[in-house]
Amino acid sequence: MTAATQMIAKALDHARSSAAPDLAAVKTRQQAAWSSGDYAVIGATLQIVGEELCEALDLRAGQKVLDVAAGNGNASLAAARRWCEVVSTDYVPALLERGRARAAAEGLALDFQQADAEALPFADATFDAVVSTFGVMFAPDQDRAAAELLRVCRAGGQIGLANWSPEGCIGQVFKTLGKYLPPAVGLKSPALWGTRARLSELFGSAALSIKTQPRYFNFRYRSPEHFLEVFTRYYGPMLKAFAALEQSKRAGLKADLLALVGQLNSSADATMVVPSEYLQVVITKR
């Protein structure tokens, strides 16, 4: 290798390393964001998604089910209502406490554990089903998170996911936030989990089948302004985004978000009904 070639190779290596995001730092920021606000206020409205996912998986009593990045426990509770043996995990302790309180109110027996989706503290092939609703899709290291879901699921078991799609309301909210606070260079969008192509990359070689179905969740609020008020108060990533911006940019972000939900609003009165597309996924492990 000539000196010139060595210099070029070194420059390319440096460019690649410079472009690679610091995933540990991203995760730390994410954990702080999800720990702020009170996601459970919003998460509880999404309960129907967990119920529908458990039906799509055709869960049976006695099956061992792991909920990854469970938030306040929507899918966890849905599985427990079907008499499954459920372990509910998240890396935000406060959200686990909300899930624990909900389970206690219903008299449901679940195991709640703090855990990182990219390093699950369970042995290989422990669970009959592994689920995540709008959770694992936010893991910074997507390949590692997918590998962990596969690792803890038994052969012939199922992985059930609900992931916001890029073109749905929440996917477009992500894009709007990204205009004001660009993500780390090289970081893959969480909304890619809502595409068949990315799921095939993440799970294809280890899957007997990947079944996907586009579905919609309707966000129902008093008005677009009410929607934004709730999300900026309780949805950690949005709360943090507004806090990080100077006043003029906050006004611009607010205007853009109101315009977005106003455009998508299907309500014929003064209220807000915005359908947000997500991808329901059922993967059978090889």
Where are these regions (language model features)?
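Conserved Class I S-adenosyl-L-methionine
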Residues: A191-R286
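A short SAM/SAH-binding and catalytic strip from SAM-dependent methyltransferases
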Residues: D128-Q142
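Conserved class I S-adenosyl-L-methionine
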Residues: D13-Q63, N74, R98, Q158-P182, L228, ...
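A short glycine-rich, Lys/Arg-flanked "PGG" loop and its adjoining helix->strand segment in the class I
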Residues: D143-Q158
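Class I SAM-dependent methyltransferase SAM/SAH-binding core
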Residues: K64-A119, A129, R144
